[in-house]
C-alpha cells in the first residue's frame, strides 16, 4: 500500500503527534495486525525492549494495552541491557548496527521522525542529504517532526547548536553478559 516512509508522510499529510508516527502505524503496526489476526498463525512477537527501568515499565504497559500481541521480551526476561546486547553481538562476531557505531542511542530509521532536537542536529551533520529531504517533506506535508512549548520547529529553521548531544549507547559485557555467553569466543 505504501512504498516507504516518505510515501506515508506525503499521502497521509501527517508526520507524528499524540497518536504516534504515521510511518509506525502504517508500515510496522499494520503488518503485525495482519499477521496476528490470522487464526493459528500467531505465537507471539519478540520485542527488543532491553533491561532498564524505562523499558521494563514500557513492556508492562505494552502487555496490558496489547495482550492480543502475545508479547515476548527475552532481553528483559534475561536481564540484558542494551549495552550488554551490543556486547553480546560483539562477542559473537556480529557487527554492531551502523547507527550505534555512529554514536546514536537507537537503531531507528535514519532520520526517525520521533527523534528530538539534538538527534536531528546530529542527523544534519552525519546525513546532510537525509536532513535536507526531511526538511523538504515537512514543508510539503505542512507538519513538523519537532515541537516545543512555542509550537512547531521546522527542520529548515532549526538552530544547528540547539538541543542536547545524543548520548551514544556504549558496548559493554557485564557479569550478566559474561555468564549468559561464557562459551562465545571473543573477537
Protein language model features and the residues they cover:
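Nucleotide-activated chemistry modules centered on ATP-dependent adenylation/adenylyltransferase
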Residues: 1-187
